[in-house]
């Protein structure tokens, strides 16, 4: 696939400018108020590139290496699940195994869905934060090496986000540098907690990780694996339906109230599932910050001042909800996502975006791929 520059004044094929421009007239109020990227990477036929920011690959070798340790006992999505949910999940993993691990099947599905490039990342449970740090590093390297191999084999269809052992910050920082500088990965996937410890837990010292991520200018994709205190969410798949967005909400709130976003401005953190509940229930945080001193112990500005710096995928399953997300945070902060290949994913991401009311075509193009291309440096 060849890309052609669309920056005004540049007719040079293969020369891609991902510049920010002043907000144009029309479009959502939030987008007009803050400005957004005006250029969009296009293919040879002039169609705007479509990039999926939220999709998973299961590394079977890594899973086999740790199978004797019974990883599921550490996974909230399994630990807090009814017997029926476990049976349904086992069947899903069996039925969707080719989609999870066979690239040719994946590419056929991408073509069917109208996706040009996936920013493929590990299956969310394959962070393995519960392992001993040395083993965690070994497995992370296996996963990252395979992702790099996929990108090298199909460079026109994939970029990759790796994984690092956050249970040991020194190893995590070193592996992050290797991912970016040696393997060419565009970022990493993390969970909203480290085996139950918050990302702001002083014992983890993850400010070093966030500082390195900012220095390298890479994407952090923060994906949950169920809620860690899911005793009340075992039936009806609630530890996914409610637990996944809840864990994202809790993890993001700690990053905001704990000052991570204030100490590391410019972090590029993408939140799946449209940001959990924060994308639509943000006003309560701001009220608490104004009303209570214990909400102002670290941050100096209202929580939404920091929330607006995050990026959100489009997985809302409803055009009006997606419209509200865009209105609040701006089209520049929203990226097409599918959660491929899981059953809770969006099967028609392009159709969902096209059905959003009152959304100008230029903003649709940015959401479908322009924003992701800018963040992931596709076309550079």
Report each predicted region and the residues it spans:
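Mid-to-C-terminal alpha-helical segments outside catalytic/metal-binding sites
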Residues: 1-49, 53, 61-117, 145-153, ...
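Hydrophobic faces of well-ordered beta-strands that scaffold small-molecule active sites
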Residues: 51-55, 118-120, 159-162, 188-190, ...
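Catalytic metal-binding/acid-base residues of hydrolase active sites
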Residues: 56, 225-226, 275, 341
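Short acidic/glycine-rich loop or secondary-structure boundary segments that cap or lie
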Residues: 60, 230, 278-282, 287, ...
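Aromatic- and acidic-residue-enriched segments that line the glycan-binding/catalytic groove
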Residues: 62-75, 134-137, 172, 176, ...
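Active-site gating/metal-coordination segments in enzymes
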Residues: 116-258
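A general structural motif
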Residues: 249-252, 291-296, 314-318
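Aromatic-lined glycan-binding groove of carbohydrate-active enzymes
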Residues: 259-307
């Amino acid at each position: 696939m060849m890309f052609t520059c669309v920056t005004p004044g540049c007719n040079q094929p293969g020369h891609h400018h991902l510049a920010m421009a002043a907000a144009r007239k029309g479009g959502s109020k939030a987008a007009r108020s803050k400005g957004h990227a005006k250029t969009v990477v296009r293919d040879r036929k002039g169609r705007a590139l479509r990039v999926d920011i939220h999709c998973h690959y299961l590394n079977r070798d890594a899973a086999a290496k740790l199978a004797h340790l019974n990883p599921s006992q550490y996974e909230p999505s399994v630990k807090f699940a009814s017997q029926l949910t476990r049976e349904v999940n086992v069947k899903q993993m069996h039925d969707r195994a080719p989609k999870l691990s066979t690239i040719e099947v994946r590419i056929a599905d991408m073509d069917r869905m109208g996706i040009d490039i996936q920013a493929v990342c590990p299956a969310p449970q394959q962070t393995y934060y519960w392992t001993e740090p040395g083993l965690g590093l070994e497995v992370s390297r296996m996963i990252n090496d395979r992702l790099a191999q996929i990108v090298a084999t199909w460079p026109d269809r994939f970029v990759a986000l790796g994984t690092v052992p956050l249970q040991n910050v020194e190893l995590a920082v070193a592996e992050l540098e290797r991912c970016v500088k040696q393997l060419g990965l565009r970022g990493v996937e993390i969970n909203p907690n480290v085996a139950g410890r918050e990302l702001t837990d002083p014992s983890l010292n993850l400010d070093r990780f966030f500082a390195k991520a900012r220095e390298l200018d890479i994407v952090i994709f923060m994906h949950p694996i169920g809620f860690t205190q899911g005793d009340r969410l075992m039936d009806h798949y609630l530890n996914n339906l409610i637990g996944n967005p809840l864990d994202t909400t809790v993890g993001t709130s700690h990053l905001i109230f704990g000052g991570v976003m204030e100490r590391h401005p410019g972090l590029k953190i993408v939140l799946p599932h449209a940001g959990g509940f924060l994308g639509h229930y943000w006003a309560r945080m701001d009220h608490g910050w104004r009303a209570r001193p214990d909400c102002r112990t670290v941050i100096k500005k209202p929580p939404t001042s920091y929330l607006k710096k995050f990026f959100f995928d489009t997985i809302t399953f409803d055009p009006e909800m997606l419209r509200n997300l865009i209105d609040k945070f701006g089209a520049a902060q929203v990226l097409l996502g599918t959660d491929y290949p899981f059953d809770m994913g969006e099967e028609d991401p392009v159709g969902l975006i096209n059905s959003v009311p009152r959304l100008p075509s230029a903003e649709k193009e940015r959401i479908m791929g322009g924003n992701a291309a800018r963040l992931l440096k596709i076309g550079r």
